[in-house]
């Protein structure tokens, strides 16, 4: 899907045919999305602005450089608390791909990952950098 950066909200979606991983780069002002969940594991980074969302019955506020970690089935919403909105990069990791990757590396059954994220947001700069690098590699088709 191509983006249209002339409007206040925009979204670029790419899907890697080999892995099934989807990469989303998006910008929203005001209300972004209603409560929903995904079958995939989500890992992403806020790139610009403040991103506010409910997840796990808590209100979270992400700022540039923070990594977001959302398990499959975790209901979340989203909005921009500031007029300039927010921009983020997100990878949607299919559970089957995660399971296969863990198995290939001898890390056991992916079911151990159920609810595995200790925090929905983290300030770990190495993790945020790794997510960003993986995002750009997939999103740009490298």
Kindly label every feature range from the protein language model.
Residues 3-111, 141:
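N-terminal regulatory/effector-sensing and dimerization cores
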Residues 105-142:
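Amphipathic alpha-helical segments enriched in hydrophobic/aromatic residues interleaved with Lys/Arg
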């Amino acid at each position: 899907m191509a983006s249209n950066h002339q409007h206040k909200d925009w979204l670029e979606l790419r899907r890697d045919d080999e892995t099934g991983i989807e990469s989303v780069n998006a910008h929203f002002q005001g209300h972004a999305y209603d409560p929903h969940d995904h079958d995939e594991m989500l890992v992403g980074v806020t790139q610009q602005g403040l991103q506010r969302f409910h997840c796990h019955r808590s209100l979270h506020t992400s700022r540039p450089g923070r990594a977001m970690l959302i398990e499959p089935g975790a209901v979340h919403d989203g909005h921009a608390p500031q007029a300039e909105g927010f921009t983020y990069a997100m990878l949607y990791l299919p559970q089957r791909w995660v399971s296969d990757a863990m198995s290939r590396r001898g890390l056991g059954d992916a079911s151990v990952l159920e609810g595995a994220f200790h925090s929905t947001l983290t300030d770990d700069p190495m993790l945020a950098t790794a997510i960003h690098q993986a995002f750009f590699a997939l999103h740009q088709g490298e």
